[in-house]
Swiss-Prot record:
Gene3D superfamilies: 1.10.8.60, P-loop containing nucleotide triphosphate hydrolases, Winged helix-like DNA-binding domain superfamily/Winged helix DNA-binding domain. Signal peptide: none annotated. This is Holliday junction branch migration complex subunit RuvB. PANTHER family: HOLLIDAY JUNCTION BRANCH MIGRATION COMPLEX SUBUNIT RUVB, PTHR42848. DNA binds at residues 292, 311, 316.
């Protein structure tokens, strides 16, 4: 599912020009003030003691800077950075090869750690806790177990689905950090910084217009800025002001609340096909022809955070804000429910 407002990484996000926009230090990293403040303390303490930083779990919606923060942690510590991801670690040997090549206090970054297979996860436990690797060599009666000592290291893991982590794995992270959606003011700062590096003629009100439609996500803000710049160049505009940004975003079908055609299709299906809910995630995913994981990880987090939908024990329900956004009249509150509950943004 490729959407200009998706927080998931896309091919264009990996271009050298885009990587050059990423902050290199905690001081340059905009937003996530509490997370940055705590990380700064933990990093300085580890450096002062000459020890490896405790293991870090970064979790939250996609596009908020988990990978960038992991790289910054290694840079601030002054150690090597090695990156991999859960889906590519198919066998214990894959992870063992990485762990045995780490130097003292290095940072190992595992993205999408919730997708780590159970047999790989099991050898990670003693590695994280005791800095040892327990491997079984051979099969059957001739199989034998060997133990390999590892250099102390820091595992920085990222996930959009912390609830899927096994409790023993989750409990081994001494520094759990949740990343939150950005405010429009923070995104404006991100956009202005990116525009300067790109040489894009972005005005303050143009930055505000993009920021309010960027779904609280820096990755989305950067992608929208690049697309808006493309339209401005094609139209011969000498600057990207509010009017130019709004026109470009309208052509991209991104509305003033940051919703695109898929978001609106999701809300419309819930309201028109299922009376506003409650409806199960499998049902709504089938109705809009999208995978359940995409619905849960990409579509729903922002809709819930903005109060368009809510989860209940019986399924998803549309809030009053969703009806109004689509130009529809919200239904009356059912007997025994206060009218205000219909507009509950939980």
């Amino acid at each position: 599912m490729t959407r200009v407002i998706s927080g998931e990484p896309q091919h264009g996000d990996l271009a050298p020009a885009d990587r050059a926009l990423r902050p290199q230090t905690l001081a340059e990293f905009v937003g996530q003030e509490q997370a940055k403040g705590n990380l700064r303390v933990f990093i300085e303490a580890a450096k002062g003691r000459g020890e490896a930083l405790d293991h870090v779990l970064l979790f939250g919606p996609p596009g908020l800077g988990k990978t960038t923060l992991a790289q910054i942690v290694a840079r601030e510590l002054g150690v090597n950075f090695r990156a991999t991801s859960g889906p590519v670690l198919n066998k214990p040997g894959d992870l063992a090869a990485i762990l045995t090549n780490l130097e003292a206090n290095d940072v190992l970054f595992i993205d999408e750690i919730h997708r780590l297979s159970s047999n790989v996860e099991e050898i990670l436990y003693p590695a994280m806790e005791d800095h040892v690797l327990d491997l079984v060599i051979g099969e059957g009666p001739s199989a034998r177990s060997i133990r390999i000592d590892l250099a102390p290291f820091t595992l920085v893991a990222a996930t959009t689905r912390a609830g899927m982590l096994a409790t023993p794995l989750r409990d081994r992270f001494g520094i759990p950090i949740r990343l939150e959606f950005y405010t429009p003011a923070e995104l404006r700062h991100v956009l202005q910084h990116a525009a300067r590096k790109m040489g894009a003629p972005l005005t303050d009100d143009g930055a505000d217009e993009i920021a309010k439609r960027a779904r609280g996500t820096p990755r989305v803000a950067g992608r929208l800025l690049r697309r808006v710049r493309d339209f401005a160049t094609a139209d011969g505009a000498d600057r990207i002001d509010r009017k130019a940004a709004a026109m470009a975003l309208a052509r991209l079908e991104v509305d003033e609340s940051g919703l695109d055609s898929l978001d609106r299709r999701y809300l419309r299906a819930m309201i028109e096909n299922y009376g506003g809910g409650p409806v199960g995630v499998e049902t709504i995913a089938y109705a809009i022809a999208e995978a359940r994981d995409a619905v849960e990880d990409v579509i729903e987090p922002y809709l819930m955070q903005q109060g368009f939908i809510q989860r209940t024990p019986r399924g998803r329900m549309a809030c009053g804000k969703a009806y109004l956004h689509l130009g529809l009249t919200p239904p009356a509150a059912p007997p025994g429910q206060a009218q205000g509950a219909l507009f509950d943004e939980g």
